[in-house]
Amino acid sequence: MKTLLLTLVVVTIVCLDLGYTRRCFTTPSVRSERCPPGQEVCYTKTWTDGHGGSRGKRVDLGCAATCPTPKKKDIKIICCSTDNCNTFPKWP
């Protein structure tokens, strides 16, 4: 009887955990959204657009399975793994 009860508790915990999905801020709307299954990392990607920053700073927020790797040296990516941890950056 104890074994059956313990098994039911473990199965319940596993099922509840599998149903959870991360929430991250996403662009262009900058609102909190549920990430697709398997994407448990929130990221903030910032870069300067245009020649010499004439068009300003750009931001991309979203979800990923793993932290994205910058393809250029002037792209900065910050990753985190709690709900809504990728807030829009504050510019100096």
Curated annotation (Swiss-Prot):
**Where does the signal sequence lie?**
1-21
Q: Does the keyword Signal apply?
A: yes
Pfam families per the record?
Toxin_cobra-type
Q: Which GO terms describe its cellular component?
A: extracellular region
Entry keyword Secreted: yes
GO terms assigned for molecular function:
acetylcholine receptor inhibitor activity; ion channel regulator activity; toxin activity
The disulfides recorded in the entry are: 24-42, 35-63, 67-79, 80-85
Keywords associated with the record:
Acetylcholine receptor inhibiting toxin, Disulfide bond, Ion channel impairing toxin, Neurotoxin, Postsynaptic neurotoxin, Secreted, Signal, Toxin
Name the organs or tissues of expression: Expressed by the venom gland.
Coiled coil segments of this chain? none
Function, as annotated: Binds with high affinity to muscular (alpha-1/CHRNA1) and neuronal (alpha-7/CHRNA7) nicotinic acetylcholine receptor (nAChR) and inhibits acetylcholine from binding to the receptor, thereby impairing neuromuscular and neuronal transmission.
Similarity comment text for this entry: Belongs to the three-finger toxin family. Long-chain subfamily. Type II alpha-neurotoxin sub-subfamily.
State the protein's name.
Answer: Long neurotoxin 1
